[in-house]
Regions:
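Secretory-pathway ectodomains
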Residues: 1-241
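Compositionally biased, intrinsically disordered or flexible polar/acidic segments
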Residues: 231-408
Length: 408
């Protein structure tokens, strides 16, 4: 039976301090969710000690100081809960820890909002700018700016993760330059309540007193998952200058962007999952058939399952502009996600006007359906435009993604 926090994890003592928990990294999956322990939306930040969350919910049914709305509700007594299960501890448990906690807030006036020192406004904080990063598409240094929608919490930089309320709870993994990940459904607090500690990303229930109609009034904890786990981000709508692209992935039919730890930023095309870099793509026909399936349907293959699971069908020609002229490695990602069997789909593909795949049957090459397949080629791109042509001889053309990496 586990006692205490996960080995190698970090504790969080509050006050918006850095908490560089290396166990908390993109992608993240849900470990548990529950609605037993709830907090008023403007309660102070919890602390995390030895795998236990120490929180002080506000007593939002108590009377406030009349004619002075800057003084908020008093605090209840500390509540202790296990971060790995969500279980609220009994008053008889962890007596040593309870005895060390200061009894604050019951008789002292509390401020209405709790924010990190860098946040200067209570409402509608500006879009965060958190240091600099290397743009994975261009290789250039730029300000680390990422999408934020509405919410009183402007975010906190915990060192490796930046977390914020962006409509729902959200986070950005700085170790990866992930883009913004929206934890859709639950509402996080007006105080920042999305905290990496104990090897988890902790998102306690900070919804009480809010009139917004969020669909999931719950708390949850998230744990790091393998790279095969499906999770999507929104990178932001950066403009793309001519001849600037050095590396890029195009994920046809995907519901969002995704950055890999080997360095490729995969963009959903068409862009549907939030703002993405403004790449210039031309297709013929202009509206081929895009399809998405969840990656859990995929078998183990050569491609990441979240790339292979989505496709474009019926594509005849594709042009991607604004590449930096030079020699490129071009990886074509495929998976037979329809019910076409062996011999029921065949296509010939030209890259920069030269045939690279002839009579290509995805099902036969992958030894089955729902299995990712990659074919890699090198080509010279002199005019800054990638050109791919597809001709189906049986059925319709099908491809999942394209990855381009400029050679040194």
């Amino acid at each position: 039976r586990r006692v205490g926090a996960l080995p190698g994890s970090a504790q969080y003592e509050g006050n918006y301090a850095r908490c560089e928990d290396t166990l908390v990294r993109f992608p993240l999956g849900v470990l548990w969710f529950d609605d037993t322990l709830s907090h008023f939306k403007r309660s102070p930040q919890p602390e995390f000690v030895d795998g236990i969350m120490v929180s002080r919910p506000k007593d939002w049914q108590a009377e406030r100081v009349k004619d002075n709305w800057s003084i908020d509700y008093p605090l209840r007594r500390p509540v202790l809960s296990d971060i790995y299960t969500g279980r609220v501890l009994l008053p008889t448990e962890q007596s040593s820890l309870r005895n060390r906690l200061p009894d604050i807030g019951r008789d002292e006036p509390q401020q209405s909002y709790y924010h990190a020192p860098h946040q200067k406004t209570m409402l509608n904080p500006p879009t965060p700018v958190v240091g600099t990063r290397i743009n994975p598409i261009t290789g250039l240094k730029e300000p680390r700016v990422f999408p934020k929608t509405y919410g009183c919490d402007g975010g906190v930089d915990y060192g490796l993760l930046y977390t914020l309320r962006s409509g729902t709870a959200a986070f950005y993994d700085k170790s990866l330059e992930s883009g913004t990940v929206f934890i859709s459904g639950p509402r996080s607090g007006c105080s920042n309540s999305i905290i990496p500690s104990g090897g988890l990303l902790n998102v306690p229930y900070f919804y009480e007193g809010c009139t917004c109609s969020y669909p999931l009034p719950i708390g949850l904890s998230m744990v790091a998952m393998p790279e095969t786990h499906e999770q999507w981000t929104s990178w932001g709508d950066d403009p793309v200058k001519p001849n600037s692209i050095l590396r890029i992935g195009i994920n046809f039919g995907a519901p969002g962007d995704r950055k890999t730890r080997d360095g490729t930023l995969w963009l959903d095309y068409p862009s549907v999952g939030g703002p993405s870099p403004q790449i210039r793509v031309e297709t013929s026909p202009t509206t081929p058939t895009f399809r998405y399936r969840h990656s859990l349907w995929m078998n183990k293959g050569q491609s990441q399952p979240w790339i292979g699971a989505s496709t474009v069908e019926g594509l005849q020609e594709l042009k991607l502009h604004d590449l930096n002229p030079g020699r490129y490695s071009v990886r074509l990602h495929f998976a037979e996600t329809d019910d076409a069997g062996k011999g029921e789909r065949s296509q010939t593909i030209h890259l920069q006007g030269k045939p690279v795949l002839s009579g290509f049957d995805i099902h036969s090459a992958a030894n089955g359906s729902m299995t990712g397949l990659v074919r890699e080629f090198e080509t010279e791109i002199d005019d800054g435009t990638l050109k791919l042509n597809f001709k189906a001889t049986v059925g319709r053309s099908l491809i999942s993604g394209i990855e381009l990496i400029r050679k040194p």
